Amino acid sequence: GADINPLWLGEEPSPKLHNINAERDLPELMLIRLAFNRQLPILGICRGAQALAVALGGKIQQDIYDEYIREEETVEKKLSKDKTVITYRAATLKHSQDAERCEATHSVTLNKSSVLYALYKEERLMVNSFHHQAVKDAGKHFRVTALSPDGVIEAIESSEFKPIMGVQWHPEWMGEEGGKLFQWLVGQSNNFYLAKQLHQRILTLDTHCDTPMFFPQGVN
């Protein structure tokens, strides 16, 4: 899809910015916020993962081949001992492949405490790649759960245990392996449906409700 307009983030456009689509940006960002507030399960793919971050307080990198990936190096000879110098570097892998969409072209490493790891039971996945932008800062509502070997954020998940996930690759082209993510989404959607049916019949009074939603009785 088109790049997300950096003006949504209070940034001026980089010379490397591609086409933008204002008619798409606004409804997507609004829908994400509405779905988030209603606890709806969400799976963001590629631009969708970036839109999740932007809509909920995170940031994206306009072009991953500019220096933005943070590194910390301890320099003992040039500086006083244990003083830390923060440096930044650019992505080094090819993230916009020329290979067919069904071909995996680089790996990602999964956080072992993530939903992704629970689904795949592997610490390393091979994925396809079609992007020049990526999540830069996941924000307070998400945590980073997958990285490429060069440090680009490849997946984010809710830090609040909501059924929300974003992946930078395109699982819809990855056959059976990609299908696991859609099975997860269907399963979470079914759980939401069952919870909603329950709350239509039973009014739950709880100071910590895991499935807050809009009730037909008029209770929000």
Residue ranges and their predicted role:
Residues 2-5, 49, 211-213:
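Glycine-rich nucleotide phosphate-binding loop and flanking beta-alpha elements
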Residues 4-23:
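Glycine/threonine-rich flexible loop motifs
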Residues 5-9, 52-55, 156, 216:
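Short glycine-/acidic-enriched loop or helix-start segments at secondary-structure transitions
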Residues 20-40, 65, 69-192:
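Amide-donor transfer/coupling interface in amidating biosynthetic enzymes
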Residues 46, 131, 170, 208-210:
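Histidine-centered divalent metal-coordination motifs
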